[in-house]
Each structure stands twice: as C-alpha cells, then as structure tokens.
Amino acid sequence: MPRYAQLVMGPAGSGKSTYCATMLEHCQALNRSVQVVNLDPAAEHFEYPVIADIRELIQVDDVMEDDSLRFGPNGGLIFCMEYFSNNFDWLEESLGHVEDDYILFDCPGQIELYTHLPVMKQLVEQLQQWEFRVCGVFLVDSQFMVETFKFISGVMAALSAMVMLEIPQVNIMTKMDLLSPKAKKEIEKYLDPDMYSMMEDNSVALRSKKFSKLTKAICGLIDDYSMVRFLPFDRTDEEGINIVLQHIDFSIQYGEDLEVKEPKEVDEEPSNSNFDAFFQDTADS
C-alpha cells in the first residue's frame, strides 16, 4: 500500500506551521489519520504534536555556537539541512512503516532550499523510495500578493520549486482571513490570473524597455502553459480547507482503492465558480 506526504513549503512567514496545524485539526474532524514532521531546525514552537522533530537530530543554535564552523543563521540552517540529508536513516526510524501513512512535512522557509540546493530534491527521492506519493504544497502570504509585481515574484518562487522538485504541486494563498473585504475582492484576480491583462494594467509602471520585455516574456510563459494557479486558504473556513485537501488528495491519488473523484473545483473558469462563496462578503463593498 502506498504512503502519502505533503511537503509544506514557502517563504518565511507564509504560514506553513499554521497550515499544518489547521490541516491536522481538519483531518482529525474527518477521522483521517494524519501526522506531522517538523523539518525546521530553527523552529521555536508550533501548535501541533509531531512524530519526528529535526531538532532532535540537529539544531541551528548548536551549529551557530560552534566556533569551528562560524555560521550565521542562514548558513547554519543550510548546514543543518545538509546534515539531515546525510542522515535520512534517522527520519526512516522516526517514521516507522505503517501502511496508508499520511504525513505533513513542515519545511524551513529558506527559499534557496527549493530553488537550487539539492537537499529537498534528495528528500523527495528518498520518500519515493519509501513508497510515499509526495505532493508539494507551496504557500505564499496573500497580504504580499496584492500587487502585480509582487505576485509575479511569488509565482516565480512557486514555479522554481515545481521545476526543481518535479512532483505534483498545489499553490496556496494563505492568511485570507486577515484580508479586508476590499482586499479579498482585489485579490480574486490573482487566484487564476490572466497574466497578459495584468501586464496591460501595469504597463505604465514598466519604464525600462529591457525589463518590460523580460517581464512580459515571463508572464507569457506562465500564461501560455497554465503553470501556476492558486487556491485561497482561510483557516476559519472549513469548506475552503476541504477544497484544498481535495486538490492535494487528487494529485497524489489518495485512497485510490476507493472511487477517486476529481475535485469539483477543477473546471475551465474557476475564478467565476470556485470562489463565489469565499468572496460573497465582498459583493456589497
């Protein structure tokens, strides 16, 4: 029987630990067995129980205090993750082997781990050898994504992780519950974006012809291949959380021995149908 894993990624402060705590609580309400593993050696606290904690193997503070290494916070974290990649047997022993395992891996926030360093790719390959079906869950803070150029930056980060790890990936805008009604209405266009229209709306801000061409080329790549779209995540909205879980389960074929159904939100114009309920509170604003 296969095992299942969500690799919860994203920049620092994007809400990875909150996502794990919320998803764990939601799955428990559905009587689904889900466990969490902390892979952030710099974590100070989190709101969920774990079956494995990388800090039992190595901690950033210990590395930084080692006079022979002389690492700062970022270098110390990279060292910890490289040490972890050489000690996957610790993770295997911590996980054990139970059929139908469903694990959430709460990962560090250093973006270079998902763009050009091999550590997370090695983790994915190791999990696959242990018969895990792995889905990347890339989080971005919705409060950061309300401007077109910031949105493009977030899309490129998500796309880099997708290309690097070569696994199914679901991209999520977190902290939707913290947005004002006006901001919710504004951000709807970024969930399933028309990149060309967005660029036309912001063409005045592109003063440099060289960078204007580059930005338009990037937007064209994203739009033409439909590579990146986002789902909203509001920790107070059980239906919205379930929609996210459906998409992830579908991508890794969770429970394939049962009748697997495609998530109801997968259709041609999701922005007009998927999120009506979520944004109904903005209709009168």
From Swiss-Prot:
Region (Disordered): 262-285
Residue positions of motif Gly-Pro-Asn (GPN)-loop: 72-74
Chain positions of site Stabilizes the phosphate intermediate: N74
Gene3D superfamilies attached to this UniProt entry: P-loop containing nucleotide triphosphate hydrolases
Disulfides per UniProt: none
Molecular function per GO: GTP binding; GTPase activity
Assembly description: Heterodimer with gpn1. Binds to RNA polymerase II (RNAPII).
Protein name: GPN-loop GTPase 3
Species the sequence originates in: Danio rerio
Classification lineage: Eukaryota, Metazoa, Chordata, Craniata, Vertebrata
Gene: gpn3
